[in-house]
Amino acid sequence: MPSVFEATAGAAIGVGSDQTGSVTQATNKGTAVTLNKVAGVVTMNGAALAAAAEVSFTVTNSECTASDVVIVNHASAGTAGSYLVQANTIAAGSFKITVSNVSGGSLSEAIVLNYQIIKAG
């Protein structure tokens, strides 16, 4: 299998543009999304997330295997520092993202998340 990573002198290491994509969550913050790319951008739904609450949603992704590592972060939009974001329940064909509101109030923001699948082996 050819590598999905590319390295160019003077540039950051990452995946090629053909291995990235984006998706916008519909309906609510718990709605599953599908994005079959090694790296991607998920724009969450702008529904309210109460203070100290968390929500999880499934990312269906044919590139993901149970032994992969998934990294996710709050990339933009919304109140910086008000969310904790993690990937979990990594399986063949999917993973979950959990977003926690660590602010003191309810937030209704369509935050943007970046994820990257690090292939095992």
Question: What spans do the regions from the language model cover?
Answer:
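Extracellular receptor-binding modules and their adjoining Ser/Thr/Gly/Asp/Asn-rich linkers
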Residues: 1-66, 89-121
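Terminal beta-strand-rich extracellular "head" domains
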Residues: 68-76
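Extended, low-complexity, turn-rich repeat/linker tracts enriched in Gly/Pro/Ser/Thr and Asp/Glu
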Residues: 76-81, 103-106
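Glycan-recognition/cleft segments
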Residues: 82-90
